[in-house]
Structures are given as structure tokens and as C-alpha cells.
């Protein structure tokens, strides 16, 4: 399982939100490229970038920062989400050297777009499913739909989606532990690999994901925990690599 540091971008800075609320953000660095360097030097094997402004505006806003990080680390797998609603935007990021593009709101509102994107950019598409109480949220988490996460995930199995990033909104940024039971249920219910996100606080949460014994959970995204020092990227990755269960 991969430990994937998150860099959330708001107005060009690296921030963390609590439960997806733009008004409840903590700025951790005004130099996201240097922050990326910190996690790379700490041994991370993939980075998770989010254009928060883009998620709310429906188009890329912090694209220059994303491009700068991708250029600095051309061999590092990078995934980007936030405001990706067109094939043109996906093409822009892929050409910039981004490995994976995360489709969130657009995947919920227009599932056929995911199939189209997978055909155009095979192996590059991740679906981001953000949920509250099992129901999918959209538009920067401002809207809660009537769509069940597991039902929607199954719809994408035939499209060739690389993975699903599953975020539990109630947990995100709160460092109170991730929703292991639902993450495991989602990974067990779909053929698509799942990356867990939201609420990871320490090594115990990483162990809980591994203890679920679901092969489909291939990664864990961590944000506030690594910024506030309750989780060490290198230590967590080493723990995953040596985990025997």
C-alpha cells in the first residue's frame, strides 16, 4: 500500500481544510513546490495534488503550480484533482507530465464522460468519489447527491478507470481516523483499486487499513497528519512495505 502525501492548493498556497470547508483552512506553506520536495525527500512514491479553487470554480486555477511540481519531478507519479471537467483540461495536465487525473464532480453528473476520458487517456484516469453517510458529494463537497458510492463505483468498472480515490467528508481534515469499514466494503465490492482518503491521524490508522485484509486498497492519502507531525511518511511507507498481517 502506498502512502500518498496530499498537497491542497488554494490561491497558490499549500493548505488543509477541515471537512472540505474553504473558510476553515490552515496555510502550511506559501511554496507548494518546496513542500513537494519535502515529501519526495521523505521517500514518497506518489503525490496527490488538489486544486481547491478549481474544484469550486469548475476549471483549473492553480495549474501553474501543478505543472511546476510535475516538471521538477518528472519520474514521480503525480495525481491531480479539482476542477477537471473537460478532455482539454485532462490533456493539458497529461502533457505537463501529470501521471493521473482525478475526475470527481463530472464523474457523478456525467458518468459517460469517464468512459470517454478513459478511451482518450488510457491508464490515466482516476475517479474521485467523495461521500457523506455513503452518498456521493459534488461541487467541492457543497452538494450531497442521492447516489450511493458503491453503486456509482460499479458503473465505472468497464471503463478502464485506474483507481478510485474514496474520501469520507466527515473524516477529512479531522484526524480522527479514516472510515475503514466503508473503505474496505467499497474495495471489496468493486474490481477497481481503491485509494483511501480522509481522517488518517497516525500509524494506527494505516495499520487498520492493512488489517482490513482487502487487496483492493492500494493506497492511503494523508494530509494534515503529515503536516502536523502525527504521521511520518517514510516510517508509514516502511511499515506498509514490511507488513505481514
Curated annotation (Swiss-Prot):
GO terms for cellular component: cytoplasm. It is found in: Cytoplasm. The active site is at residues 8, 130. It comes from the Bacteria. Pfam families: His_biosynth. GO terms for molecular function: 1-(5-phosphoribosyl)-5-[(5-phosphoribosylamino)methylideneamino]imidazole-4-carboxamide isomerase activity. InterPro entries: Aldolase_TIM, His_biosynth, HisA_bact_arch, Isoase_HisA-like, Isoase_HisA-like_bact, RibuloseP-bd_barrel. Pathway: Amino-acid biosynthesis; L-histidine biosynthesis; L-histidine from 5-phospho-alpha-D-ribose 1-diphosphate: step 4/9. Its EC number is 5.3.1.16. It catalyses: 1-(5-phospho-beta-D-ribosyl)-5-[(5-phospho-beta-D-ribosylamino)methylideneamino]imidazole-4-carboxamide = 5-[(5-phospho-1-deoxy-D-ribulos-1-ylimino)methylamino]-1-(5-phospho-beta-D-ribosyl)imidazole-4-carboxamide. Keywords: Amino-acid biosynthesis, Cytoplasm, Histidine biosynthesis, Isomerase. One of its GO terms (biological process) is L-histidine biosynthetic process. Belongs to the HisA/HisF family. NCBIfam families: 1-(5-phosphoribosyl)-5-[(5-phosphoribosylamino)methylideneamino]imidazole-4-carboxamide isomerase (TIGR00007). PANTHER family: 1-(5-PHOSPHORIBOSYL)-5-[(5-PHOSPHORIBOSYLAMINO)METHYLIDENEAMINO] IMIDAZOLE-4-CARBOXAMIDE ISOMERASE (PTHR43090:SF2). This is 1-(5-phosphoribosyl)-5-[(5-phosphoribosylamino)methylideneamino] imidazole-4-carboxamide isomerase. The lineage of its organism: Bacteria, Pseudomonadati, Pseudomonadota, Gammaproteobacteria, Pseudomonadales. The gene is hisA.
Amino acid at each position: 500500500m502506498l502512502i500518498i502525501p496530499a498537497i491542497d492548493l488554494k490561491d497558490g498556497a499549500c493548505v488543509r481544510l477541515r471537512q472540505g470547508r474553504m473558510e476553515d483552512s490552515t496555510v502550511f506553506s506559501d511554496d507548494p513546490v518546496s513542500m513537494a520536495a519535502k515529501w519526495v525527500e521523505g521517500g514518497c512514491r506518489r503525490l496527490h495534488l488538489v486544486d481547491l479553487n478549481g474544484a469550486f470554480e469548475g476549471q483549473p486555477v492553480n495549474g501553474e503550480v501543478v505543472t511546476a511540481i510535475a516538471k521538477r519531478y518528472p519520474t514521480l507519479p503525480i495525481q491531480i484533482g479539482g476542477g477537471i471537467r473537460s478532455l482539454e483540461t485532462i490533456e493539458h495536465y497529461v502533457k505537463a507530465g501529470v501521471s493521473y487525473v482525478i475526475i470527481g464532480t463530472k464523474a457523478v453528473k456525467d458518468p459517460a464522460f469517464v468512459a470517454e476520458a478513459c478511451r482518450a487517456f488510457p491508464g490515466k484516469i482516476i475517479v474521485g468519489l467523495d461521500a457523506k453517510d455513503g452518498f456521493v458529494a459534488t461541487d467541492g463537497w457543497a452538494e450531497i447527491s442521492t447516489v450511493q458510492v458503491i453503486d456509482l463505483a460499479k458503473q465505472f468498472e468497464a471503463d478502464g478507470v485506474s483507481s478510485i480515490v474514496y474520501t469520507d467528508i466527515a473524516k477529512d481534515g479531522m484526524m480522527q481516523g479514516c472510515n475503514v469499514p466503508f473503505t474496505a466494503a467499497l474495495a471489496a465490492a468493486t474490481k477497481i483499486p481503491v485509494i483511501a482518503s480522509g481522517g488518517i491521524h497516525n500509524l494506527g490508522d494505516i495499520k487498520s487499513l492493512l488489517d482490513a485484509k482487502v487487496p483492493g486498497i492500494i493506497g492511503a492519502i494523508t494530509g494534515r497528519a503529515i503536516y502536523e507531525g502525527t504521521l511520518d511518511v517514510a516510517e508509514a511507507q516502511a511499515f506498509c512495505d514490511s507488513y505481514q498481517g
